[in-house]
Amino acid sequence: MFKPLLSAELFFNWTAKDFKDKTSFLKQACRVLQDKNCIKEEQIALTALKEREAQITTGIMSKLALPHMQSATVLKPFVAVFKVNNVDWQSLDNQPVKLIFLIGVPKDQGNLHLEFISQFSKLMLQDEFANKVPNIRSFNGLINLIDSFQQTAVASQPVVNEAAAQTEEPKDTNTQYDFVAVTACPTGIAHTFMAKEALEKFARDHNLKVKVETQGTDGIQNQLTESDLNNTKGIILACDRLIDLTRFYGHANVVEVSTTKAIKTPQTVYDQVVKKEGKLLGNKSSDSASQTELKETTEQLSFKDFHKRIYRAILSGVSYMLPFVVFGGILIAIAFLIDINNAGNAGKQFGSKDPIANWFKTLGGLSFGLIVPILSAYIAFALVGRQGLLPGFIVGLISAGKFLLNIDIVTGKIDWATESKVSSGFFGAIFGGLLAAVLIIVQQRYIYRKLPQALQGIKNILFIPLLGTLVTAALFWVINIPLIYLNYGLSKFLQIMDKPYLAPLLGLVIGLMMCFDLGGPVNKAAYVFGVVSLESQNSGTVAMASAILSGMVPPLGIAIAATIRKQCFDKEELPAAYACYVMGLSFISEGAIPFVAKRPKIMLAANLIGGAVCGVLTGAFALTIRAPHGGVFVFALLKTNLEGIAGNTLQIGAGVGLALLALIVSSFISAGIIIGHNLLVVRKKTKQLVNTNA
């Protein structure tokens, strides 16, 4: 059972302490757990626990809380028990907490925390246990209470629940469950199992035959079969997160509630099943399109919180786009490297004069040419599901200039029937993806809503893909005109910023952004801006060079600091710190994330200062690069446009040398800040020790 996780050493009576809220408790608890060698870093543990609490409270009623974490900072599995005096935990029943079980499991170990929560949930659903456990005052009292009620629980386990717990299909296909259920919460831990136990206890108390599936961090357990779904009076989905609804399509009386409601009022939930207040999910049409419309929920196909979803949709589109950028960009970089002998005389044909180089450049160009359509398609997909893919991709192709309508930017003359030679680029992709999503929602909610039932089956395979995409493309064809001018303006802006007197400022901004959150939205925005500059100018740019070189600084600074002064890091961190040489040289900024998470203040300062210096030097040296990724492996594609350096070969050679200089200087500055901070900390501790001994 779960008792081996409990120990007298980790039982704390803190009734004399006063905590204004759960955050103040967690801070002190993490400090004690670090002293007990349960965790490595109290700040990381505190962050993990606070993030879990932000999803849904772990105050489970009966004046108990089960905060938990699975983190690399946990050294060994543990359950620490804290007896406290009425801590406000924002619990499900709005009652203050008197007893706290704080659970920690290492990142790479099993699911002991799940077993504890599952077993403890069963005990908590016994009213007498729930009433007694908050009042225990000692470790032995807790163990004795658990022992007595575990024996009771085993002795009273009903046969009907054993049958319900079987995953195989019933032998008698006419035998019905009173209800079947699925439970799932954002973390897949406490509330998932609490809801399961609450529903099963309710069934036992009322002599009902049930089966409950859990979708937790250990995967799907006790999975419902098609036979189970066909032989039940109702289906309860007690879920706080999105799950795959496909297998429930065509089944009636589906009741959707939160895990909290299932835990607190299972009677009310069951009454909904009895009164047949559940709904019919989807339909059981044989059309494959109807059967595969999973995750396109009512909320998704509506304008509810649409403005809040736009930001996440754009980031989602960027994440789908990046593999095309990296693949295409690196192949183009390889083409330039193969064709390096022709760098001095190939002119605009550089990278394609050699047949093999031309093969790589053409293939890379195919991938690179898809980044705008992919971005648009997956922005629409993130907002409305797969119905947004087709119109999103089409408007993305129009944005990329793959359709009719050519504009003379200077005169403003429009030729509607000529193949386009201009594009709206990323502006068109973002606006087009949003437009496609909006029109899909309008069609689903307001136009095709009242179609006869006989036509509903072909709505999603004919009306929306055909007519909807035609309308979207026609509207965007016209709307795209101002977006083309906007993209042209960006191109001109980038050309201005590449000038010697402004390039350092551009490098400074991009350098700071690249090193701010290391793979987060600010970092991605800076990187995408660099990619946009390549797409807009069709040549190497200062923006792209600044993004790549600055993004290499954080991991390199860490590696250099570890090499010069090992004491800057814990012994177990040193291998990862040395590995940052490879990470940094490969332009993988995320290699620095574990170190930033552990020492956020000093590491962020070192990263930002190092990145800013690198960006300024990149701009001052007028460095440009044609590849969007690759780190040191694409340095041969660097050039400098400094005055006085003429000729392609000399520009490349000087560009590589100046880039190495900028990278080395900024990385050593970053490392120096880390080392300096460590020396100050050691000096401060030494001084305190001397004063104490004195």
From Swiss-Prot:
This protein's GO CC annotations: plasma membrane
SUPFAM superfamilies the record matches: Phoshotransferase/anion transport protein, PTS system IIB component-like
Highest taxon, organism lineage: Bacteria
An individual GO BP term: phosphoenolpyruvate-dependent sugar phosphotransferase system
Enzyme class: transferase
Domain PTS EIIB type-2 residues, every copy: 179-275
Location within or outside the cell: Cell membrane
Reaction(s) catalysed by this chain's protein: D-fructose(out) + N(pros)-phospho-L-histidyl-[protein] = D-fructose 1-phosphate(in) + L-histidyl-[protein]
Gene3D superfamilies attached to this UniProt entry: 3.40.50.2300, Mannitol-specific EII, Chain A (3.40.930.10)
Chain positions with Phosphohistidine modification: 68
E.C. designation(s): 2.7.1.202
Domain PTS EIIC type-2: 310-687
Any one GO molecular-function label of the UniProt entry: kinase activity
PROSITE patterns per UniProt: PTS_EIIA_TYPE_2, PTS_EIIB_TYPE_2, PTS_EIIC_TYPE_2
InterPro entries on file: Bacterial_PTS_Sugar_Transport, PTrfase/Anion_transptr, PTS_EIIA_type-2_dom, PTS_EIIB-like_sf, PTS_EIIB_2, PTS_EIIB_2/3, PTS_EIIC, PTS_EIIC_2
Active-site residues per Swiss-Prot or TrEMBL entry: 68 (tele-phosphohistidine intermediate), 185 (phosphocysteine intermediate)
Membrane topology of the entry: Multi-pass membrane protein
Disulfide bonds listed in the record: none
Function: The phosphoenolpyruvate-dependent sugar phosphotransferase system (sugar PTS), a major carbohydrate active transport system, catalyzes the phosphorylation of incoming sugar substrates concomitantly with their translocation across the cell membrane. This system is involved in fructose transport.
Database matches in PANTHER family: FRUCTOSE-LIKE PERMEASE (PTHR30505), FRUCTOSE-LIKE PTS SYSTEM EIIBC COMPONENT-RELATED (PTHR30505:SF0)
Domain notes: The PTS EIIA type-2 domain is phosphorylated by phospho-HPr on a histidyl residue. Then, it transfers the phosphoryl group to the PTS EIIB type-2 domain.
Protein name: PTS system fructose-specific EIIABC component
Gene from which the chain derives: fruA
